Amino acid sequence: MAKYSIIMEKKNKLFDRTEYIIQVEHPKEKTPTREEAKEKIAEMLNVDKNKLVIKKIVSKYGLPYSFIYARVYDNIDTAKRVELKQILRRNNLQ
């Protein structure tokens, strides 16, 4: 079972979002998919998963942890206006 912990949390008032860096420890498991990570992070932060955008998941070969760069928007319309189209597609928001 992967363990999620918040490394950094930063409020970005300009874009009406909160930015997170989350460390996922997944010993002897694969790196979590975007959808798996989105479910767990939305549950952990108690937010609507449609307002959660995962920008990237960074893993290094052989290490049992990954870093997830995530953003939680106050309004989904802001996310659709600000985020790149490919990021929205990867998060099933387009």
UniProtKB/Swiss-Prot annotation:
SUPFAM superfamilies given in the database record: Ribosomal proteins S24e, L23 and L15e
Keywords: Ribonucleoprotein, Ribosomal protein
Signal sequence annotation: none
Keyword Phosphoprotein found: no
Tree of life domain: Archaea
Entries under Pfam families matching the protein: Ribosomal_S24e
Single biological process term from Gene Ontology: translation
GO MF terms, alphabetically ordered: structural constituent of ribosome
InterPro entries, sorted: Nucleotide-bd_a/b_plait_sf, Ribosomal_eS24, Ribosomal_eS24_CS, Ribosomal_uL23/eL15/eS24_sf
GO cellular component: ribonucleoprotein complex; ribosome
Family to which this protein belongs: Belongs to the eukaryotic ribosomal protein eS24 family.
Protein name: Small ribosomal subunit protein eS24
Organism: Nanoarchaeum equitans (strain Kin4-M)
